[in-house]
């Protein structure tokens, strides 16, 4: 739908090997700092995701953190190299359809079990490892009749470019019934 609105497009992605490990190590360490005491005192009252992150963070050692740092640096370089070749990357905002709020996470995608509760978010968190500028736009509905979104990414500090591309794409998407922003029927939601 929107490829024709760019001078050139190409399919590809940066090498994000080990990105999941790096993200999960840093996430776990952060959760220990932010929520460790809370988990020690109130483990039974907290979400299983908070508890999982703290437990995961406590299980890592300094070598794990050092390796995660090297992995993150490689991934950031790969993203930055890609942003030398292209102005923006456009990809789905999530790997799944929206799911019920009482479901803590996605356990599997396309019959592949997720190794951790957060793995389904990889398409969103991997670009953050390079501090990518990002915007998320609604882009119609998916095959399950649920809202679908795309993310527009560029190099760190290119927020203005990302916003300009997002605005232009928003106008293009709004002109096609299949990609226009879905407006919920509020009467159905309140009945």
List the model feature ranges, each with a label.
Residues 117-130:
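Hydrophobic alpha-helical segments in the ANL/AMP-binding
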Residues 21-26, 67, 99-120:
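Short, surface-exposed loop/helix-turn segments at secondary-structure junctions
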Residues 56-70, 77, 85, 128-191:
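Structural helix-boundary/capping segments
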Residues 88:
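Short, Asp-centered acidic motifs that coordinate Mg2+ and/or phosphate
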Residues 9-13, 24-77, 92, 96, ...:
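Short helix-loop capping/hinge segments that flank enzyme active sites or metal/cofactor-binding pockets
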């Amino acid at each position: 739908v929107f490829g024709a609105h760019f001078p050139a497009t190409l399919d590809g992605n940066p090498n994000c090997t080990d990105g999941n490990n790096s993200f999960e190590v840093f996430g776990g360490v952060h959760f220990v700092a932010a929520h460790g005491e809370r988990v020690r005192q109130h483990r039974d009252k907290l979400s299983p995701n908070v508890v999982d992150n703290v437990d995961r963070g406590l299980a890592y050692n300094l070598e794990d953190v050092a390796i995660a740092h090297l992995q993150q640096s490689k991934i950031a370089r790969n993203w930055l190299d890609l942003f030398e070749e292209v102005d923006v990357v456009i990809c789905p905002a999530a790997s799944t359809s929206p799911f019920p709020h009482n479901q803590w996470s996605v356990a599997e995608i396309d019959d592949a079990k997720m190794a951790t509760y957060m793995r389904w978010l990889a398409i969103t968190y991997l670009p953050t490892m390079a501090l990518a500028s990002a915007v998320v736009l609604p882009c119609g509905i998916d095959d399950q009749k649920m809202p679908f979104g795309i993310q527009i990414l560029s190099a760190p500090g290119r927020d203005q470019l990302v916003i300009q591309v997002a605005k232009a794409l928003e106008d293009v998407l709004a002109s096609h019934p299949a990609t226009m922003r879905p407006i919920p029927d509020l009467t159905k939601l309140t009945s």
